Protein backbone atom coordinates (compact mmCIF):
# COMPACT_ATOMS: atom_id res chain seq x y z
CA UNK A 1 0.00 0.00 0.00
CA UNK A 2 1.16 3.53 -0.77
CA UNK A 3 1.59 5.75 2.29
CA UNK A 4 0.54 9.05 0.76
CA UNK A 5 -1.11 10.66 3.78
CA UNK A 6 -0.31 14.37 3.97
CA UNK A 7 1.77 14.52 0.80
CA UNK A 8 1.13 17.19 -1.83
CA UNK A 9 0.44 16.55 -5.50
CA UNK A 10 -0.26 18.70 -8.55
CA UNK A 11 -2.59 16.98 -11.05
CA UNK A 12 -3.37 18.72 -14.34
CA UNK A 13 -6.43 18.17 -16.47
CA UNK A 14 -8.30 17.44 -13.25
CA UNK A 15 -11.77 18.52 -14.37
CA UNK A 16 -12.66 15.27 -16.13
CA UNK A 17 -11.51 11.89 -17.39
CA UNK A 18 -8.19 10.46 -16.22
CA UNK A 19 -7.15 13.63 -14.39
CA UNK A 20 -10.32 13.71 -12.33
CA UNK A 21 -10.05 10.01 -11.49
CA UNK A 22 -6.41 10.42 -10.42
CA UNK A 23 -7.11 13.56 -8.38
CA UNK A 24 -10.05 11.97 -6.56
CA UNK A 25 -8.16 8.74 -5.90
CA UNK A 26 -5.10 10.54 -4.52
CA UNK A 27 -7.34 12.66 -2.30
CA UNK A 28 -8.92 9.44 -1.02
CA UNK A 29 -5.40 8.22 -0.22
CA UNK A 30 -4.96 11.25 2.05
CA UNK A 31 -2.97 13.51 -0.26
CA UNK A 32 -3.40 17.27 -0.57
CA UNK A 33 -4.41 17.54 -4.22
CA UNK A 34 -3.94 20.72 -6.23
CA UNK A 35 -6.15 20.04 -9.24
CA UNK A 36 -5.44 22.23 -12.25
CA UNK A 37 -7.57 22.79 -15.35
CA UNK A 38 -8.62 25.54 -17.71
CA UNK A 39 -12.14 25.24 -16.27
CA UNK A 40 -13.30 24.90 -12.69
CA UNK A 41 -15.09 21.61 -12.09
CA UNK A 42 -14.85 18.72 -9.65
CA UNK A 43 -11.49 18.58 -7.86
CA UNK A 44 -10.07 21.62 -9.68
CA UNK A 45 -8.64 24.20 -7.26
CA UNK A 46 -6.57 26.23 -9.74
CA UNK A 47 -7.81 27.52 -13.09
CA UNK A 48 -4.90 27.95 -15.49
CA UNK A 49 -4.15 27.88 -19.20
CA UNK A 50 -1.42 25.27 -19.37
CA UNK A 51 -0.50 26.19 -22.94
CA UNK A 52 1.25 29.24 -21.42
CA UNK A 53 4.30 29.61 -19.20
CA UNK A 54 2.27 31.77 -16.84
CA UNK A 55 -0.38 29.09 -16.41
CA UNK A 56 2.15 26.41 -15.50
CA UNK A 57 3.92 28.74 -13.08
CA UNK A 58 0.58 29.60 -11.48
CA UNK A 59 -0.17 25.92 -10.91
CA UNK A 60 3.13 25.26 -9.14
CA UNK A 61 3.07 28.52 -7.18
CA UNK A 62 -0.46 27.79 -5.95
CA UNK A 63 0.63 24.42 -4.56
CA UNK A 64 3.68 25.90 -2.85
CA UNK A 65 1.70 28.81 -1.40
CA UNK A 66 -1.04 26.53 -0.07
CA UNK A 67 1.10 23.67 1.24
CA UNK A 68 4.75 24.76 1.24
CA UNK A 69 5.94 21.75 -0.73
CA UNK A 70 5.28 19.48 -3.71
CA UNK A 71 5.88 15.74 -3.44
CA UNK A 72 4.28 14.51 -6.65
CA UNK A 73 3.58 16.00 -10.08
CA UNK A 74 1.09 14.32 -12.43
CA UNK A 75 0.99 16.07 -15.84
CA UNK A 76 -2.16 14.81 -17.50
CA UNK A 77 -3.94 17.63 -19.35
CA UNK A 78 -4.58 16.74 -22.95
CA UNK A 79 -6.38 17.51 -26.17
CA UNK A 80 -6.55 15.84 -29.58
CA UNK A 81 -6.76 16.89 -33.22
CA UNK A 82 -7.02 14.45 -36.11
CA UNK A 83 -5.87 15.53 -39.56
CA UNK A 84 -3.45 14.44 -42.31
CA UNK A 85 -0.02 16.05 -42.06
CA UNK A 86 -0.53 18.14 -45.21
CA UNK A 87 -3.73 19.64 -43.80
CA UNK A 88 -2.76 19.83 -40.12
CA UNK A 89 -3.34 23.43 -38.90
CA UNK A 90 -0.14 24.98 -37.58
CA UNK A 91 -1.98 26.64 -34.68
CA UNK A 92 -3.39 23.28 -33.59
CA UNK A 93 0.13 21.78 -33.73
CA UNK A 94 1.32 24.59 -31.46
CA UNK A 95 -1.60 24.10 -29.07
CA UNK A 96 -1.15 20.34 -28.77
CA UNK A 97 2.61 20.39 -28.35
CA UNK A 98 2.36 23.22 -25.81
CA UNK A 99 -0.15 21.32 -23.69
CA UNK A 100 1.18 17.78 -24.12
CA UNK A 101 4.95 18.37 -24.02
CA UNK A 102 5.92 21.91 -23.03
CA UNK A 103 3.56 21.96 -20.04
CA UNK A 104 4.99 18.74 -18.53
CA UNK A 105 8.48 20.22 -18.97
CA UNK A 106 7.53 23.51 -17.32
CA UNK A 107 5.79 21.78 -14.42
CA UNK A 108 8.94 19.72 -13.82
CA UNK A 109 11.15 22.81 -14.11
CA UNK A 110 9.15 24.94 -11.70
CA UNK A 111 8.50 22.14 -9.18
CA UNK A 112 12.01 20.64 -9.38
CA UNK A 113 13.53 22.29 -6.27
CA UNK A 114 10.64 21.00 -4.16
CA UNK A 115 10.74 17.53 -5.73
CA UNK A 116 14.47 17.34 -4.98
CA UNK A 117 13.90 18.43 -1.39
CA UNK A 118 11.20 15.81 -0.83
CA UNK A 119 12.69 13.03 -2.97
CA UNK A 120 9.47 13.23 -4.91
CA UNK A 121 7.90 11.50 -7.87
CA UNK A 122 6.90 12.64 -11.32
CA UNK A 123 4.26 10.49 -13.00
CA UNK A 124 3.25 11.68 -16.46
CA UNK A 125 0.08 10.43 -18.09
CA UNK A 126 1.33 9.62 -21.57
CA UNK A 127 -0.34 7.16 -23.95
CA UNK A 128 0.24 4.01 -25.92
CA UNK A 129 0.82 6.58 -28.66
CA UNK A 130 4.09 7.32 -26.91
CA UNK A 131 5.35 3.91 -28.06
CA UNK A 132 3.36 3.27 -31.26
CA UNK A 133 1.95 5.48 -34.02
CA UNK A 134 -1.32 5.89 -35.91
CA UNK A 135 -2.04 8.04 -38.96
CA UNK A 136 -3.53 11.54 -38.76
CA UNK A 137 -2.36 12.27 -35.19
CA UNK A 138 1.05 13.79 -35.87
CA UNK A 139 1.04 16.41 -33.10
CA UNK A 140 -0.35 14.12 -30.39
CA UNK A 141 2.00 11.25 -31.19
CA UNK A 142 5.06 13.48 -31.57
CA UNK A 143 4.33 15.07 -28.19
CA UNK A 144 3.71 11.77 -26.41
CA UNK A 145 6.95 10.29 -27.80
CA UNK A 146 8.72 13.44 -26.63
CA UNK A 147 7.14 13.14 -23.19
CA UNK A 148 8.71 9.70 -22.74
CA UNK A 149 12.06 11.24 -23.65
CA UNK A 150 11.53 13.94 -21.04
CA UNK A 151 10.74 11.29 -18.43
CA UNK A 152 14.05 9.55 -19.16
CA UNK A 153 15.99 12.80 -18.70
CA UNK A 154 14.17 13.63 -15.46
CA UNK A 155 14.89 10.13 -14.16
CA UNK A 156 18.62 10.50 -14.79
CA UNK A 157 18.81 14.01 -13.36
CA UNK A 158 16.66 13.14 -10.36
CA UNK A 159 18.32 9.86 -9.38
CA UNK A 160 21.05 11.38 -7.15
CA UNK A 161 18.34 13.11 -5.08
CA UNK A 162 15.89 10.22 -4.93
CA UNK A 163 13.46 11.72 -7.46
CA UNK A 164 11.81 9.18 -9.77
CA UNK A 165 10.13 9.89 -13.10
CA UNK A 166 7.79 7.53 -14.90
CA UNK A 167 4.91 7.61 -17.37
CA UNK A 168 1.66 5.68 -17.62
CA UNK A 169 0.82 4.71 -21.20
CA UNK A 170 -2.78 3.51 -21.49
CA UNK A 171 -4.60 2.47 -24.62
CA UNK A 172 -7.96 4.08 -25.32
CA UNK A 173 -9.56 5.20 -22.05
CA UNK A 174 -13.24 5.88 -21.44
CA UNK A 175 -12.93 9.68 -21.32
CA UNK A 176 -14.82 12.58 -22.95
CA UNK A 177 -11.93 12.93 -25.42
CA UNK A 178 -12.33 9.33 -26.61
CA UNK A 179 -16.14 9.43 -26.52
CA UNK A 180 -16.03 12.46 -28.81
CA UNK A 181 -13.73 10.55 -31.17
CA UNK A 182 -16.23 7.67 -31.26
CA UNK A 183 -19.05 10.05 -32.21
CA UNK A 184 -16.91 11.73 -34.89
CA UNK A 185 -15.80 8.39 -36.35
CA UNK A 186 -19.41 7.16 -36.42
CA UNK A 187 -20.40 10.14 -38.54
CA UNK A 188 -17.34 9.82 -40.78
CA UNK A 189 -17.84 6.09 -41.41
CA UNK A 190 -21.66 6.08 -41.43
CA UNK A 191 -21.63 3.47 -38.64
CA UNK A 192 -23.32 3.24 -35.27
CA UNK A 193 -21.15 4.08 -32.25
CA UNK A 194 -21.03 0.52 -30.87
CA UNK A 195 -19.63 -0.76 -34.16
CA UNK A 196 -17.12 2.10 -34.32
CA UNK A 197 -15.95 1.25 -30.82
CA UNK A 198 -15.30 -2.41 -31.69
CA UNK A 199 -14.21 -2.18 -35.33
CA UNK A 200 -12.28 1.11 -35.32
CA UNK A 201 -11.32 2.35 -31.86
CA UNK A 202 -10.57 -1.03 -30.28
CA UNK A 203 -9.19 -2.66 -33.43
CA UNK A 204 -5.55 -2.47 -32.17
CA UNK A 205 -6.46 -3.75 -28.68
CA UNK A 206 -6.02 -7.47 -28.08
CA UNK A 207 -8.49 -7.11 -25.19
CA UNK A 208 -11.60 -5.53 -26.68
CA UNK A 209 -12.61 -2.99 -24.07
CA UNK A 210 -11.76 0.55 -23.09
CA UNK A 211 -9.43 1.17 -20.17
CA UNK A 212 -11.32 2.79 -17.30
CA UNK A 213 -10.05 6.05 -15.75
CA UNK A 214 -10.06 4.37 -12.32
CA UNK A 215 -7.63 1.75 -13.65
CA UNK A 216 -5.20 4.47 -14.67
CA UNK A 217 -5.58 5.99 -11.20
CA UNK A 218 -4.77 2.57 -9.70
CA UNK A 219 -1.56 2.49 -11.75
CA UNK A 220 -0.57 5.95 -10.52
CA UNK A 221 -1.10 4.91 -6.89
CA UNK A 222 1.02 1.79 -7.47
CA UNK A 223 3.83 3.91 -8.93
CA UNK A 224 3.68 6.17 -5.88
CA UNK A 225 3.91 3.22 -3.50
CA UNK A 226 6.89 1.17 -2.29
CA UNK A 227 6.96 -1.02 -5.42
CA UNK A 228 7.20 2.11 -7.56
CA UNK A 229 10.61 2.97 -6.14
CA UNK A 230 12.20 0.63 -8.69
CA UNK A 231 10.41 2.31 -11.61
CA UNK A 232 12.16 5.33 -13.06
CA UNK A 233 12.92 6.44 -16.60
CA UNK A 234 10.52 3.90 -18.04
CA UNK A 235 6.84 3.78 -19.00
CA UNK A 236 4.16 1.57 -17.50
CA UNK A 237 2.25 0.45 -20.59
CA UNK A 238 -1.37 -0.61 -19.97
CA UNK A 239 -2.64 -0.86 -23.53
CA UNK A 240 -4.70 -4.08 -23.58
CA UNK A 241 -2.04 -5.76 -25.74
CA UNK A 242 -1.89 -3.06 -28.43
CA UNK A 243 1.90 -2.72 -28.49
CA UNK A 244 2.36 -6.51 -28.53
CA UNK A 245 1.23 -6.62 -32.16
Region locations from a protein language model:
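Active-site helix of classical SDR
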Residues: 108, 143, 151
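C-terminal helical subdomain
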Residues: 167, 175, 191-231, 238-240
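Short, small/polar-rich loop/turn modules that mediate ligand/substrate recognition or access, typified
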Residues: 74, 159, 164, 231-233
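Short C-terminal tail/terminal secondary-structure segment
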Residues: 5, 132, 220, 232-245
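Residue(s) in the substrate-gating loop at a strand-loop-helix junction
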Residues: 127
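Alpha-helical segment proximal to the catalytic Tyr-Lys
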Residues: 113, 156-157
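Substrate-binding pocket helix/loop in short-chain dehydrogenase/reductase
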Residues: 84-85, 92-97, 201
Amino acid sequence: MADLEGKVTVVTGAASGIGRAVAERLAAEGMHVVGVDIRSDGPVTVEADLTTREGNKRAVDAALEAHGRIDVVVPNAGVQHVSPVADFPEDRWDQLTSLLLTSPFLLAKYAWPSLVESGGRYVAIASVHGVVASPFKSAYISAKHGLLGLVKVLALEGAPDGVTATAVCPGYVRTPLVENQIADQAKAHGMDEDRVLEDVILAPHAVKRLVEPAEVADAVVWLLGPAGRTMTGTPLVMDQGWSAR
